[in-house]
Swiss-Prot record:
Its EC number is 3.4.24.-. SUPFAM superfamilies: Metalloproteases ('zincins'), catalytic domain. Belongs to the peptidase M43B family. It comes from the Eukaryota. Glycans are attached at residue 52. This is Extracellular metalloprotease MCYG_03238. One of its GO terms (cellular component) is extracellular region.
Length: 278
């Protein structure tokens, strides 16, 4: 099934514009300890080399009475196989309400299956959220697992400048075990907030696409192009005049466009330790 066709139809569901990126993913209190132990176990087992992963994926499109390809993971050796797409008309779910009831009704697959729920309105101005993996998930953890994404953030949606699908990439990063690249304690340059060695220490989240941003001098410039920052997804370049058609063309340049090798290695190990075969 073509992700691009599905995502284009999802884009038509939302007219919500986003003023700033707001991510609702919150690591559970034991995740730092569990992920550290998982990295150590994977390293001891020799699972640090890159191996191809295919994640069974289910899309659930929620509407309220009106009427994808997740391709940024290819270089990481992680692919997403779209198994099914469901479409549901439910006003409460479309506004982010009754999450448990929605997932109890719609969720498919095991803990290794990614369920993505697209809704036209989310509470608190969120663009989306995913649940971090757990070492020993309860039945409820398995039920609520997955991602809830604002429909307007998919390619062609209305949540500019966050409407190129990078919100889904960002949130799925959390599903795969990645933190934000910036320190959640804003302004703190004393510790590495994301537990990945090749992302420079970053004291603040990014807004826009400010080249050379350096919130922690001496630690390396901020990772403004990283999928796990809060940057805009693209930058509008100066118009280029087309003399043949006598009109100006607007050109865009991607801002959010990369994972580091360290992040890729972490996702691979988190998958093997927390989700594979479950």
């Amino acid at each position: 099934m073509r992700f691009s066709i599905v995502l284009s139809s999802i884009a038509a569901l939302s007219s919500v514009a986003a003023a700033e990126r707001v991510c609702g993913a919150i690591p559970h209190r034991t995740f730092a300890k569990e992920s550290k132990a998982a990295i150590e176990a994977a390293t001891a087992a020799g699972l640090t080399t890159k191996a191809n992963i295919t994640v069974e994926t289910y899309f659930h499109v929620i509407t309220a009475g009106s009427k994808g390809e997740i391709n940024n993971y290819g270089p990481a050796g992680i692919g997403f196989k779209l198994m099914d797409v469901s479409r549901t008309d439910n006003a409460k779910w479309a506004s982010g309400g009754d999450e448990t009831g929605m997932k109890k009704s719609l969720r498919k697959g095991g803990y290794s299956a990614l369920n993505v729920y697209f809704a036209p309105n989310l509470e608190g101005g969120l663009l989306g959220f995913c649940y971090f993996p757990k070492a020993n998930p309860s039945a409820n953890d398995k039920l609520v697992d997955g991602c809830v994404i604002l429909s307007g953030s998919v390619p062609g949606g209305e949540a500019a400048p966050y409407n190129e699908g990078k919100t889904t990439t960002h949130e799925v990063g959390h599903y795969m075990g990645l933190y934000h690249v910036f320190n959640e304690e804003q302004g703190n340059c004393q510790k590495d907030g994301d537990m990945v060695a090749d992302t420079p220490v970053q004291g603040t989240k990014t807004s826009g696409c400010p080249q050379g941003k350096d919130s922690c001098p001496g630690q390396g410039v901020d990772s403004i192009h990283n999928y796990m920052d809060y940057s805009d997804e693209y930058v509008l370049l100066s118009p280029v005049y087309d003399s043949w058609h006598q009109t100006n063309h607007r050109h865009f340049s991607p801002c959010m466009n990369q994972f580091t090798p360290g992040q890729i290695s972490r996702m691979q190990m988190m998958w093997q330790q927390f989700r594979a075969g479950k």
